[in-house]
């Protein structure tokens, strides 16, 4: 019993330290780097010179930009042209807010352009990290390759993923995930953030604790993946963990 109690105490300490590290990352000066790039470089350059640089694309009327990330040969980021911190923002459950996940899916074409040939949809994944799982305080969806092992696991669970949010058997990367199948028409009409907030009990009150990802399945449907922060299991809800920015799946 004493050993069990000690182990539990150690886990608590580790969780607190992990939370502290996450908070430290978010309070450093570099946590505003992406926001400054969008608001002070990409947007003004597009408006004044019709040049999106350093972004790959700037769409002021649609409310988003696409930026080549410095990590990985094919990774891009989709970000709003205005201030949204992350998954905790109530703007994401406002129907008037752009459907950023759908826009990010359209932006996957930048991967193919960079690669020099079409990148199969099955190799693409989208991910946004939770408040404690991110290092930047400007909303950004990672557009990148999926890890081959995650791709295989999702393929094997194709029949187990329904149109309701249910636990994904075995989880992913050692963490628990909820999975939900959506059609393309559903995705066009309704943001995954709204699906999560409206369909998962108590999710709306804790949106900042969730990381969210999206992958296309072999039947042309999409699967949404949501993981919630759980510091006792060292899960910071960094949905980006399903991605491989080196794109081994293309080799």
From Swiss-Prot:
Catalytic function, reaction form: a CDP-1,2-diacyl-sn-glycerol + H2O = a 1,2-diacyl-sn-glycero-3-phosphate + CMP + 2 H(+)
Family: Belongs to the Cdh family.
Spans through the membrane: 4-24
Principal cellular location given in the protein's record: membrane
GO cellular component: plasma membrane
GO biological process, one term: phospholipid biosynthetic process
Bilayer topology: Single-pass membrane protein
InterPro entries: CDP-diacylglyc_Pase, CDP-diacylglyc_Pase_proteobac, HIT-like_sf
Entry protein name: CDP-diacylglycerol pyrophosphatase
Pathway: Phospholipid metabolism; CDP-diacylglycerol degradation; phosphatidate from CDP-diacylglycerol: step 1/1
Organism: Escherichia coli O127:H6 (strain E2348/69 / EPEC)
SUPFAM superfamilies: HIT-like
Keyword Lipid metabolism assigned: yes
Gene Ontology molecular-function annotations: CDP-diacylglycerol diphosphatase activity
EC number(s) recorded for this UniProt protein: 3.6.1.26
Gene3D superfamilies: HIT family - CDH-like
Superkingdom as given in the UniProt entry: Bacteria
UniProt keywords, alphabetically: Cell inner membrane, Cell membrane, Hydrolase, Lipid biosynthesis, Lipid metabolism, Membrane, Phospholipid biosynthesis, Phospholipid metabolism, Transmembrane, Transmembrane helix
Subcellular location: Cell inner membrane
């Amino acid at each position: 019993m004493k050993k069990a109690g000690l182990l539990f105490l150690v886990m608590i300490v580790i969780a607190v330290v992990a939370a502290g590290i996450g908070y430290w990352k978010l309070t450093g000066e570099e946590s505003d780097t992406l926001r400054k790039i969008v608001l002070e470089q990409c947007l003004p350059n597009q408006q004044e010179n019709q040049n999106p640089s350093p972004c790959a694309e700037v769409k002021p009327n649609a409310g988003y930009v696409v930026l080549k990330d410095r990590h990985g040969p094919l990774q891009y980021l989709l970000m709003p042209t205005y201030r949204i911190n992350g998954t905790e923002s109530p703007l994401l459950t406002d129907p008037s807010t752009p459907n950023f996940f759908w826009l990010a899916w359209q932006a996957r074409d930048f991967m193919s352009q960079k690669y020099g040939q079409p990148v199969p949809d099955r190799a693409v994944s989208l991910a946004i990290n939770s408040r404690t799982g991110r290092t930047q305080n400007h909303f950004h969806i990672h557009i990148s390759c999926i890890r081959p092992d995650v791709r295989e696991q999702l393929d094997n669970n194709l029949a187990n993923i329904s149109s309701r949010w249910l636990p994904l058997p075995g989880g992913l990367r050692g963490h628990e995930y909820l999975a939900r199948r959506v059609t393309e028409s559903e995705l066009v009409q309704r943001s995954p953030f709204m699906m999560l907030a409206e369909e998962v009990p108590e999710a709306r009150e804790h949106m900042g604790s969730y990381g969210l990802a999206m992958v296309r399945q072999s039947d042309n449907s999409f699967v949404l993946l949501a993981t919630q922060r759980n510091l006792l299991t060292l899960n910071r809800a960094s949905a980006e963990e399903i991605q491989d920015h080196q794109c081994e799946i293309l080799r």
